[in-house]
């Protein structure tokens, strides 16, 4: 057993040979390397599978033994300072390693088909291999310097993968935005690490925890300074895990290939921030103000992410805001001190969200044959619909992932989210109300995505759509850039959304709705049926087995992974697999809890949370189910006519919610106006001072000297005797002036 742990340090480096060899091969032997592309893919999957098996073995052993910490290499700078390189194996490391490798393997298998026609196929796999290596190095790190090194590598890999299609200006801007935003967080993290070293004199996790506990017990620490260091440490996870207000990079990161979106949102980039907060929780937990800040940032992100997802038309962007909201739940749990619930939700959400992203990639892949390869078309849910009969396997998998994220039992996210909601009730009633309300919003926007994508008919053939930019209704009045130029900002949302080519009418009109097969009215969209012509229509088809296989495996994970946190026996609440791994786990909310499971309380709380989820699903179903398929929706809409007195108020509310969501809460606009433009203005002023004033003074002295020399040259008549005469005259005058000044002092 000890022999096995001695080689744990090699975990991050097992997948590393493939990206290194690919990089060298593409530079020196590009043709031969490209001809062996399938072999490189197999090697990537094989090496990551070895890491997965190793991680599984370590996880099993973690149930029976304590944490393992060992330094492998040391760089001594002087007698008082040295850098250590080692590994720290504990249940958190084991769980994260399994999560990274399982999702990573499935994404690699998926990418083999998804990226097969891309010219950057091998470059993509090189980046992916390096990404997995960086994340594995991060979770096995034994000290903060090592963490920061791999933390930066994770950010670099995300920059490369988000901007993988760097020839597209949108993708290039997206990767720059992600890079710059994370620089802010990384700078704060670096300052926090240096401040913590100033206090404790060590970077090692175990030494940090022990030294700091002693300082606290002896009251030998400046509490304000440590609070500042703790906050700076938390700034890094705020940016990396897309927490408010440094979340702005996450939706733009969807410009990268779909497989990398799945990996970033499930097991790598955004999970890194949650991991670091969990790793440093023994430090944060002794500072109530930092714990409250963590929970506050988490609850704000929970609500903000859910509201921003309400009006997205891009399927990947909607899922991105969903990730942001779910990460907020995890951060909220960590801020409440519910360590186990946060990590449980990290696990269940990772597999559910990977399933949803790979499912969306399958949909996008099938839609590209119909609408083309532009993401503005292939990812646009407005052009989808009616895919149930065309992609039944993908539809079933996507539905399971959607239900899981909504918190429907017995799927994975139900168990973890229910724990967080229950803990929020113990922590703060206000936080509990927000968390529970957001659970309903989650169900609403997730089923909105599902219904727009799979229900009804294929909207591509029902839209007045052309591949060229036009002023047709395909701009949908609220979606296209072209329409934004001519949009009257005073328009109400509801009248605008239900307008057709000849007139504009309100969603809540005075006369009863009539059955019409030519118009489908939905909140936020209107789709016109212009009739079928004689041309042949093509429809999406199910993806290949290489794409479906990872989706089906993730489907199984989504169905059964929640079992690791369920106490199946009656011995106590800490007798499930997850609790055995995290024993003794940090949980401030259940220190005095009973040693048995109160199933009545569990069922009561579960019924409440599931009821909220079903209410959100019901609202989404009423608003987004195809109207022409049933008369029930018309009856529902006609009942709204009785609300004439509330019509204007209701329209204003919908208009506000839509504008808030579609414009990203105006946060991007705020940053652009008051931060980016201010920095650019300051840069312009600095440039003016540097070139006009600083350079002007220097150049002025030089020009003045030049003209004085020119004048002197003509006065001397180009004779040495004249130059000597003038020189001696000037020296004499200078000495006389100096003498008189000196004489006056006496």
Swiss-Prot record:
Self-association state and partner proteins as the record states: NDH is composed of at least 16 different subunits, 5 of which are encoded in the nucleus.
Keywords (A to Z) from UniProt: Chloroplast, Membrane, NAD, NADP, Plastid, Plastoquinone, Quinone, Thylakoid, Translocase, Transmembrane, Transmembrane helix, Transport
Transmembrane segments: 9-29, 39-59, 89-109, 125-145, 147-167, 185-205, 221-241, 258-278, 280-300, 327-347, 354-374, 396-416, 425-445, 547-567, 608-628, 723-743
A Gene Ontology BP annotation from the UniProt entry: ATP synthesis coupled electron transport
SS bonds (residue pairs): none
GO molecular function: NADH dehydrogenase (ubiquinone) activity; quinone binding
Domain of life: Eukaryota
Family statement drawn from the similarity comment of this UniProt entry: Belongs to the complex I subunit 5 family.
Name by which UniProt lists this protein: NAD(P)H-quinone oxidoreductase subunit 5, chloroplastic
Membrane topology according to the record: Multi-pass membrane protein
One CC-aspect GO term: chloroplast thylakoid membrane
Protein purpose: NDH shuttles electrons from NAD(P)H:plastoquinone, via FMN and iron-sulfur (Fe-S) centers, to quinones in the photosynthetic chain and possibly in a chloroplast respiratory chain. The immediate electron acceptor for the enzyme in this species is believed to be plastoquinone. Couples the redox reaction to proton translocation, and thus conserves the redox energy in a proton gradient.
Top-level taxonomy: Eukaryota, Viridiplantae, Streptophyta, Embryophyta, Tracheophyta
NCBIfam families to which the protein is assigned, alphabetical: NDH_I_L, PRK06590.1
Reactions listed under catalytic activity: a plastoquinone + NADH + (n+1) H(+)(in) = a plastoquinol + NAD(+) + n H(+)(out); a plastoquinone + NADPH + (n+1) H(+)(in) = a plastoquinol + NADP(+) + n H(+)(out)
Leading EC class: translocase
Assigned EC number: 7.1.1.-
Compartment(s) of residence: Plastid, Chloroplast thylakoid membrane
């Amino acid at each position: 057993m000890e022999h096995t742990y001695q080689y744990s340090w090699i975990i991050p480096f097992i997948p590393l040979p493939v990206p290194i060899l690919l990089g060298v091969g593409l530079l020196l032997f590009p043709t031969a390397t490209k001809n062996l592309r399938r072999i490189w893919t197999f090697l990537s999957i094989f090496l990551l599978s070895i890491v997965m098996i190793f991680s599984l073995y370590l996880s099993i052993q973690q149930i029976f033994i304590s944490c393992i910490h060992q330094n492998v290499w040391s760089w001594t700078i002087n007698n008082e300072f040295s850098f250590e390189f080692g590994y720290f194996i504990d249940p958190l490391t084991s769980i994260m390693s399994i999560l990274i490798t399982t999702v990573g393997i499935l994404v690699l298998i998926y990418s083999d088909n998804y990226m097969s026609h891309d010219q950057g196929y091998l470059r993509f796999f090189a980046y992916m291999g390096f990404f997995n290596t960086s994340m594995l190095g991060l979770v096995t790190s034994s000290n903060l310097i090592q963490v920061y090194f791999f933390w930066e590598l994770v950010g670099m890999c995300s920059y490369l993968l988000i901007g993988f299609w760097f020839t597209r200006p949108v993708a290039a801007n997206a990767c720059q935005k992600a890079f710059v935003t994370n620089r802010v967080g990384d700078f704060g993290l670096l300052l926090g690490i240096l401040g913590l070293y100033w206090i404790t004199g060590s970077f090692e996790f175990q030494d940090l925890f022990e030294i700091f506990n002693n300082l606290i017990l002896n009251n030998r620490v400046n509490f304000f300074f440590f609070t500042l260091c703790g906050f700076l440490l938390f700034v890094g996870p705020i940016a990396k895990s897309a927490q408010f207000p440094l979340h702005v990079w996450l939706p733009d990161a969807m410009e990268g290939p779909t497989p990398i979106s799945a990996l970033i949102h499930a097991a790598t980039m955004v999970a890194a921030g949650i991991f670091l907060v969990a790793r440093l929780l023994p430090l944060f937990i002794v500072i109530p103000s930092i714990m409250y800040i963590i929970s506050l940032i988490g609850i704000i992100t929970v609500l903000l992410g859910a509201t921003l997802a309400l009006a997205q038309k891009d399927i990947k962007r909607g899922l991105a805001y969903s990730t942001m909201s779910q990460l907020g739940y995890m951060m909220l749990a960590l801020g409440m001190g519910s360590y186990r619930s946060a990590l449980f939700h990290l696990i269940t959400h990772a597999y559910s969200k990977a399933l949803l992203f790979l499912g969306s990639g399958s949909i996008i892949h099938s839609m590209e044959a119909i609408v083309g390869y532009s993401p503005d078309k292939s990812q646009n849910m407005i052009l989808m619909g009616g895919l149930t009969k065309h992609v039944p396997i993908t539809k079933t998998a996507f539905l399971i992932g959607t239900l899981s994220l909504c918190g429907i039992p017995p799927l994975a996210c139900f168990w973890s989210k229910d724990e967080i909601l229950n803990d929020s009730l113990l922590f703060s009633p206000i936080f509990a109300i927000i968390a529970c309300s957001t659970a309903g919003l989650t169900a609403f926007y997730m089923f909105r995505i599902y219904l727009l994508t799979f229900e009804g008919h294929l909207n591509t053939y029902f839209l007045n759509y052309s591949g060229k930019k036009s002023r047709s209704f395909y701009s949908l009045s609220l979606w296209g850039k072209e329409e934004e130029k001519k949009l009257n900002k005073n328009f109400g949302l509801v009248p605008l959304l239900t307008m057709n080519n000849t007139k504009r009418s309100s969603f809540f009109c005075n006369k009863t709705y009539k059955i019409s097969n030519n118009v489908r009215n939905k909140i936020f969209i209107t789709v016109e049926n212009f009739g079928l012509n004689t041309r042949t229509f093509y429809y999406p088809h199910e993806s290949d087995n290489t794409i479906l296989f990872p989706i089906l495996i993730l489907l199984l994970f989504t169905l059964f992974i929640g079992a690791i946190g369920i106490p199946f026996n009656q011995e106590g609440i800490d007798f499930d697999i997850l609790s055995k791994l995290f024993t003794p786990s940090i949980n401030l909310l259940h220190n005095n809890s009973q040693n048995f499971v109160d199933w009545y309380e569990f069922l009561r709380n579960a019924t409440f949370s599931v009821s909220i989820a079903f209410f959100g699903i019901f609202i989404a179903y009423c608003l987004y189910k195809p109207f022409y398929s049933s008369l029930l929706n018309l009856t529902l809409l006609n009942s709204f006519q009785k609300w004439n007195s509330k019509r204007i108020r209701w329209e204003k509310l919908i208009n506000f919610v839509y504008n808030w969501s579609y414009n990203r809460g105006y946060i991007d606009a705020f940053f652009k106006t008051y931060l980016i433009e201010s920095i650019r203005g300051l840069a312009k002023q600095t440039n003016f001072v540097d070139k006009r004033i600083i350079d002007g003074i220097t150049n002025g002295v030089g020009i003045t000297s030049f003209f004085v020399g020119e004048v002197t040259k003509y006065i001397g008549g180009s004779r040495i005797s004249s130059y000597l005469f003038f020189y001696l005259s000037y020296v004499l005058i200078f000495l006389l002036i100096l003498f008189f000044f000196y004489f006056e002092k006496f």
